[in-house]
A protein has these predicted regions:
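N-terminal single-pass transmembrane signal-anchor helix
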Residues: 1-24
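Alpha-helical transmembrane signal-anchor/signal-peptide segments
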Residues: 30-43
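Short, glycine/small-hydrophobic-rich surface segments
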Residues: 51-72
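Aromatic-capped interface at the extracytoplasmic side
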Residues: 24-30
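Intrinsically disordered, low-complexity regions enriched in Pro/Ser/Thr/Gly and acidic residues
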Residues: 69-142
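N-terminal alpha-helical signal peptides/signal-anchor transmembrane segments
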Residues: 40-55
Length: 142
């Protein structure tokens, strides 16, 4: 009779602690993914700034937006359409959260062609190019 009672107590304790552990893991992963999204945006925007200020060029930036167990980077969007009001901005979204906005400094206009460069979960190669005129062009090439 004592063994089934111990098993029952153990099951209750596990049942009470699992949601707390899961919530903590989810919060930790969301925070880590937010840092990774900001670092990714910073890497792309820094290259765009260097190319824009130097008068032109092309460079590829590798990005890793793989997700975790409880959260993932849903979207990174950089720039806007040509001459769009958000051309010097970037935004990202982690699953279960609202979009976070960032502004490049110095402000450099960037475009993904018809609008913002949009990158979802996974590993990608982003080509950053500028021909000396207009905004810096961003494209996913791999």
């Amino acid at each position: 009779m004592e063994l089934p009672f111990r098993v029952l107590v153990a099951a209750v304790v596990v049942g009470l602690t699992v949601p707390t552990v899961f919530a903590g893991l989810s919060a930790y992963e969301s925070q880590q993914l937010s840092v990774r999204a900001i670092q990714t945006i910073d890497a792309i925007v820094r290259v765009a700034q260097e190319i824009y200020l130097s008068g032109g060029g092309v460079e590829d930036v590798r990005v890793d937006l793989e997700g975790g167990i409880t959260a993932r980077i849903e979207l990174i969007a950089i720039g806007d359409s040509q001459d769009g009001p958000l051309a010097a901005t970037a935004r990202y979204q982690i699953s279960g959260q609202g979009e976070a906005f960032l502004i490049s400094d110095p402000q450099v206009p960037m475009t993904g062609g018809d609008g913002a460069l949009r990158v979802g979960p996974g590993r990608h190669v982003v080509r950053v190019s500028h021909d000396g005129e207009g905004p810096v062009r961003l494209a996913v090439v791999g």
